[in-house]
């Protein structure tokens, strides 16, 4: 996973269009896995902390729970609880492992109630979702998470994400009447100008 410096102008632009614009709950999703959702969330959470915001990151990506990966070595004691990872500057609700908890988060009203409770203690909440095309029985559908958030950002990997997956993902979000704040083009797979000039 790539770590973005929080002083990148791109991070500042995304922050100003989300938390800086008054959004308190923001879901980050993508058309397919590996497009950079988690890296962006970590950078935005750290940026929000610099503005003295009390930040919660909720990992609902049960397909590939990157943020919770280190926690997997510890036994599961039932209900998932919020933790404060050292040196992160934000609190984290790890991805649920208990099937009953996963099924509850698939219910819009349950997730909405949880968000209302969390907002009593936190200034802003970022949601790390599964990719829109990740179909798995234990996934929490990302379009449900996006629906209950005030805004959503869609990440697309340039040169790697097929157009049909992007269209299908946007259609899923439209069907749920999701407030799509915008899209971010991740150009990590695009060749640099120098390499293109050398190739020519």
Regions found by a protein language model. Name each.
Residues 1-35, 62, 66, 160-200:
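Short boundary/hinge segments that flank catalytic cores
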Residues 2-5, 12, 16-17, 29-34, ...:
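P-loop/Walker-type NTP enzyme "switch/lid" segment
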Residues 23, 52-53:
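Short coil/turn connectors at secondary-structure junctions
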Residues 26-44, 48-50:
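Glycine-rich phosphate-binding P-loop
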Residues 46, 54, 199-200:
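Short, charged/polar low-complexity linear motifs in solvent-exposed/disordered segments
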Residues 50-52, 87, 175-178:
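Short, well-ordered coil/turn elements that cap or connect secondary structure elements
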Residues 106-124, 129-200:
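Conserved catalytic-core segment of NTP-binding enzymes
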């Amino acid at each position: 996973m790539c770590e973005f410096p929080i002083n990148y102008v791109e991070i500042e632009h995304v922050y100003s269009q989300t938390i800086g614009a008054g959004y308190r709950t923001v879901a980050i999703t993508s058309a397919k896995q590996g497009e950079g959702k988690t890296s962006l969330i970590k950078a935005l959470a750290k940026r929000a902390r610099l503005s003295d915001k009390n930040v919660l990151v909720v990992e609902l990506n049960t397909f590939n729970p990157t943020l919770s990966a280190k926690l997997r070595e510890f036994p599961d004691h039932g209900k998932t609880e919020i933790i404060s990872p050292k040196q992160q500057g934000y609190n984290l609700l790890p991805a649920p492992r208990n099937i009953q908890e996963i099924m509850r988060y698939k219910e819009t009203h349950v997730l909405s109630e949880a968000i209302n409770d969390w907002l009593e203690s936190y200034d802003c909440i970022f949601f790390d979702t599964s990719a829109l095309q990740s179909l798995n029985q234990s996934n929490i559908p990302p379009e449900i998470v996006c629906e209950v958030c005030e805004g959503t950002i869609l990440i697309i990997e340039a040169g790697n994400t097929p157009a049909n997956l992007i269209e299908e993902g946007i259609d899923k979000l439209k069907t749920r009447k999701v407030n799509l704040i915008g899209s971010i083009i991740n150009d990590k797979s695009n060749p640099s100008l120098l390499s293109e000039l050398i190739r020519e």
